[in-house]
């Protein structure tokens, strides 16, 4: 099979990225993140209570919920609420978002409160979980900044930024930031969550069509690191404008 050739962008290029801070007025932090045709609204809400297992421990918590609007995909998705339960995919993704954010927050400095992250996909074209993590960090930083500016916290508990991106191999070609057609037809698909200092929080890798070697994985991680560096700059630009 011939090597895959992207028409609209280079193999090591992100899709067009746009992050709009303060997208919604009735929450402590929010943004709209657009990664090509994938669009996710991310919000952060401060709750002056913690889950029961943390009461009296003088530390906070960050948790996340994720969902897709019925019209976010080409054919209407049934609302999970109407089915009476969340899908395994939804539970997996929201746990991933929560883990990724908690990894960069000092929970003791956050104090005995929690921040609830909501990621709602309004248009899906691949990479919704990675876009959610990248956008959720912006919403979280805005909410925490509010706690600091209001004098509730004396210092910012966020240690460093975090972002995520997908990489994969399509017809033998390593690609950065897969869209839906690429993701659905790839040989392998890897989602990588990384901090600003280059530390890996999570790697989710699957051989969809053909197994990949450790050498190939290393190349994909390097490709992801390049993309995440660019995403971190987009986050910084959005927060500077917030």
Swiss-Prot record:
Coiled coil: none annotated. InterPro entries: ExoRNase_PH_dom1, ExoRNase_PH_dom2, ExoRNase_PH_dom2_sf, PNPase/RNase_PH_dom_sf, Ribosomal_Su5_D2-typ_SF, RNase_PH, RNase_PH_bac-type, RNase_PH_CS. The keyword Oxidoreductase does not apply. Keywords: Nucleotidyltransferase, RNA-binding, rRNA processing, Transferase, tRNA processing, tRNA-binding. Pfam families: RNase_PH, RNase_PH_C. One of its GO terms (biological process) is rRNA processing. GO terms for molecular function: 3'-5'-RNA exonuclease activity; tRNA binding; tRNA nucleotidyltransferase activity. It catalyses: tRNA(n+1) + phosphate = tRNA(n) + a ribonucleoside 5'-diphosphate. Its EC number is 2.7.7.56. Disulfide bonds: none annotated. Phosphate binds at residues 89, 127-129. CDD domains: RNase_PH_bact. PROSITE patterns: RIBONUCLEASE_PH. Homohexameric ring arranged as a trimer of dimers. Phosphorolytic 3'-5' exoribonuclease that plays an important role in tRNA 3'-end maturation. Removes nucleotide residues following the 3'-CCA terminus of tRNAs; can also add nucleotides to the ends of RNA molecules by using nucleoside diphosphates as substrates, but this may not be physiologically important. Probably plays a role in initiation of 16S rRNA degradation (leading to ribosome degradation) during starvation. NCBIfam families: RNasePH (TIGR01966). Belongs to the RNase PH family. This is Ribonuclease PH. It comes from Neisseria meningitidis serogroup C / serotype 2a (strain ATCC 700532 / DSM 15464 / FAM18). The gene is rph.
């Amino acid at each position: 099979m011939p090597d895959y050739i992207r028409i609209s962008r280079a193999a090591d290029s992100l899709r067009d990225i746009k992050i709009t801070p303060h997208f919604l007025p009735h929450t402590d932090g929010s943004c709209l993140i657009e990664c090509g045709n994938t669009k996710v609204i991310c919000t952060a809400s401060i709750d002056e209570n913690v889950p029961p297992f943390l009461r009296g421990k003088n530390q906070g918590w960050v948790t996340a919920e994720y969902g897709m609007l019925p019209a976010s995909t080409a054919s209407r998705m049934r609302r999970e609420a109407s089915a009476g339960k969340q899908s395994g995919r939804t539970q997996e993704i929201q746990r991933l978002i929560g883990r990724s954010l908690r990894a960069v927050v000092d929970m003791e400095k956050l104090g005995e409160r929690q921040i609830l992250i909501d990621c709602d996909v309004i248009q899906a074209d691949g990479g919704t979980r990675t876009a959610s993590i990248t956008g959720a960090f912006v919403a979280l930083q805005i909410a925490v900044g509010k706690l600091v500016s209001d004098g509730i916290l004396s210092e910012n508990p966020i240690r460093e930024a975090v972002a995520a991106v997908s990489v994969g191999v399509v017809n033998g070609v390593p690609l950065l930031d897969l869209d839906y057609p690429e993701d659905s037809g790839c040989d392998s698909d890897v989602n990588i969550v990384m901090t600003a200092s280059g530390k890996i929080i999570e790697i989710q890798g699957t051989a969809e069509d053909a197994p990949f070697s450790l050498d190939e994985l290393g190349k994909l991680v390097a490709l992801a690191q390049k993309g995440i560096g660019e995403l971190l700059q987009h986050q910084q630009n959005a927060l500077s404008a917030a």
